[in-house]
């Protein structure tokens, strides 16, 4: 029987693999080479073609996850490592670069849900954090 460390290590390896894929292929993932329009050679104006440097380690990801108590940086909800193996799960952890012009460095990343990371990626305003906090506060007060 595998010990707990062996079992959870696969989750960290998957998250690390996702970071490396994003640094090479962008958040949209790998593209096929069959059709130039689908291969990433011809991209929309808002899509970056530059690669991002990765200096973080699996150990860094674990440390940040524990510093955030396993919760999404933006939504403060629990993230599920198991959801890393669920295709398109909005609750799976995702590595979010705070400054999208910089690479994946310890001082430039937070762990968030795929849901929040995708939303933040589509919204370029610097007020994302305060707006999310206000939305969550209003949602809580409306439910009381």
Give the ranges of each region predicted by the language model.
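Histidine-centered nuclease catalytic patch
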Residues: 52-54, 61-63, 74-111
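Short, charged surface segments at domain edges that flank catalytic/cofactor-binding sites
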Residues: 4-7, 11-71
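Short Fe-S-cluster ligation motifs
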Residues: 105-117, 139-144
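Short Cys/His-centered divalent metal-binding micro-motifs
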Residues: 80-81, 109-131
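Domain-exit/linker segments immediately C-terminal to small folded modules
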Residues: 97, 130-140, 144
